[in-house]
Structures are given as structure tokens and as C-alpha cells.
Amino acid sequence: MHPVVNTEQAQAWNGYEGDHWADHHDRWNAVNGGFDEPLFTAAAIGPRDHVLDIGCGAGRTTRLAARQAADGRALGIDLSAPMLARARAEAAGEGLANAAFVQGDAQVHPFAPAAFDVAVSRFATMFFGDPVAAFANIRGALRPGGRLAFVCMGDPGRNDWLRVLTALGEHLPVPPPPSPGDPGMFSLAEPDRVREVLADAGYADIGATAVEAPMHWGRDAADAARFLLGSGPAHHLLAGADRATARRAEDTLTAALRPHAGPAGVRLRGAALVVTAVAP
């Protein structure tokens, strides 16, 4: 793998988090898949396009891009070796010869200049250590007139999964809700911030549109609670908790999720931004 600057993210995604996402890739696609349609509509991938998928994870979006670019190609890049192993296996199983994957840090990866017509990303760009440098590096990989389209987390207050997690505060040290622009998952949640970052990175025709979609977390409240507690912020909150506290936290979260359960399982509103830009 080429040099990495986002070392904290690399450690996380090559440890427990990466293994969890690789092992549960279908479930994470059920959580995030409601945003695929607005993302790929914005990307407008053509049949001969060469597509770069940033932070591709287990490769769902890379495979979607490869199908749309049937006479082109799609390259997924990610820090996580466990997720890339899953991505390669899934693409091979689907017979997608035009999908490939590379382990690397998109912020500094030595992409071939002007090699791609489109760059896409689903919920990965929020974690860049230096977003201006990262997006500038991606711009260099796009041909003149090439398109950037990504979805990132939107207004924290409109993400119901985050609100539900506050129920854990009865038992665990839940931090205050994040504000748009805070480092991490919501670092690009403010449209003006996104426009500023992309303008500084050299892009033109920048757009940011708020979208919402249901996120499917589990077949019932108990299943969804176990899944939410198995990864991400909730998993870290449980670190160090004794068994009794962890059990009470799970029971409380299950109760908070019951109002969101229906015949199709537990669905919570997710809010994101669909961002588009052009490389001059």
C-alpha cells in the first residue's frame, strides 16, 4: 500500500471496525443503500466512463458503477484490507471483470493524472484528515470536465439513528450531539462548508442538496439494537462497561427502537447531502 496520512482511520478500518463491516456488508448496504439512487443519479455515469469510487468499503458502490460503465471500468480505493477482500470476492462472484480495487489513502494516493471521468463516494469523504488536500488529489485524477459526486452525512438533528442512540445516556457516557462541521462523521454536514472545501480544492459548479432516505437497521427492535451496539459510536460507548451495564443499555436501546419497527423491519430516517462538482 502507498503512504497513508490518515493513520487513525487506517488503524480503525484495519481492525475491529473493518472486520465488522466486512462481515456484515449486506446489513450495512441495507442501512446506507437508500442513498444509492440519488448518488448515482447525480453521478450520471456513462457506459464508457472510467469511475473512481472513494472509500469503497466492501465494494457495493464500485459494483454499481461497474455495471453502469459496462464498456468502461470502476476502481474502488479504501484503507481497509478486510473490506477490500470482501469487495474483490463479491465482484468476482458477480463476474464483474471491469471492477478493480486498490488499498490506499485517497488523500495522498498517486492516481494517474486525468485517468477518470467520474469520482463517486458513499459516506466516506467525511473522514479525510485534510479534506482540501484530499479533494485536490482526487481532482487531479479527474480529466478536465470530470465529475465528482458523493453523499455525506447531513444535518445531525435529522438523523434519527443518532437521536435514538441518545437513549444510551441513561447508562453510558454519551457525548453531546455533534454539530455540523465538527470533526468526524458530520464534518461536511454543512452545505456552506462543503462548498468552501471544494472551492479551495479547485472545483467548479459546486452543488449540495439535502436528501433523506430510510435506513434499515434490523428485522426487529432487538436485532437492530444488537447491530447498532456492535459497531461505530455505540460500540465505543460500551467499551469498559460491565456486563450488567451493557445489558441494561441494550434493553434501553431496544425499547427506544420499538416505535420504529414495522413489517419491513426497523427503519430510521437518515439525512445526507448529495454533493456535485466539476474538475475544470
Predicted regions and their residues:
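A generic alpha-to-beta junction signature in SAM-dependent methyltransferases
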Residues: A43-I45, Q68-A69, L142
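Conserved class I S-adenosyl-L-methionine
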Residues: M1-P47, R60-L64, M83-R86, G93
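Conserved catalytic/acceptor-binding region of the Class I
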Residues: V132, R139, R143, R147-R219, ...
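Conserved Class I S-adenosyl-L-methionine
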Residues: H2, A12, H20, H24, ...
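Class I SAM-dependent methyltransferase SAM/SAH-binding core
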Residues: H50-H109, A133
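Conserved hydrophobic residues forming the short capping helix/wall of the S-adenosyl-L-methionine
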Residues: A69, A91, G169, L198, ...
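A short SAM/SAH-binding and catalytic strip from SAM-dependent methyltransferases
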Residues: D117-P131, G154
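A short acidic, Gly/Pro-enriched loop at the edge of an enzyme's catalytic core
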Residues: Q107-V118
